């Protein structure tokens, strides 16, 4: 989709007081956090290795969330104890947990989504399936966006389910977009300027809206919309929630809606958070920002991840309006700054509306899952 079909404008508002459109303020519950932690006793017969693995032994983090049958369900990334002791050096699978109150969870003993001997094996092994986001369609289908990682390339994968237990994988979201150029991207750090590697192709949230108290994938101008990206935040469209096309400038480069801001919490780069929410005020995009070393927010540790919010036009998802100058959630507590990413993270990926409150689920230091809540508006 070319930029000619949409338009981009707007100026960031650097306000120090809460803005009326913002979801928040977020507070952490007095008890219960972190809500999901590693369990070395959990084992799973891996279909590729053909042997039992301790699939959630080391880290459980970066959660998606959805409301189903009056409960909150969380799909969380779990890392086993294989591979090497470095970030991304283990195999990731997705576990499932359910809660009646959003804080106390009952967990499945085995992962519900994982690399297997299927047509996505080459994209998902040995790195695994990472960093999920989930939405529900109007007809009750669950659509999962996740990172496929084979330790050489990554992409946003798409999968669907009717029960959160049994999944159909469709492969990369942009597999056939623009001649397949997005399917060939090599891994690169978001700050790497080598153009041969391409645009970082991960982290995707499909736009939703509240319909009778449920967050449902929203259709605008006859299409579904998805904000995606790490390094900058981009936009894509779809007619079926499965096959997606990035919105591009006339020169074929993916449009950039949010970019790094020197002196702010997202000074190194912004990255898409949970599925955005369309409201009368506009589309609220909760996103994660990485603080730059030396040129970032002086009140936030170097390389820390914190969550902020941006607002886009409710009728034109490419029209940027405003974003928060300060994070709405940042690493402050020990469990948010202790783990395999000691610089600290409050990495938001799951957002639900439940019992007239917002529940925001986030990864802590790439190691744990926690929750913060905000009043419903």
PLM regions and their residue ranges:
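Bacterial N-terminal signal peptides
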Residues: 2-11
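Beta-rich carbohydrate-recognition and catalytic domains
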Residues: 16-127, 135-268, 277-341, 355-377
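ATP/pyrophosphate-binding catalytic subdomain of soluble kinases
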Residues: 271
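C-terminal structured domain segments
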Residues: 341-344, 348
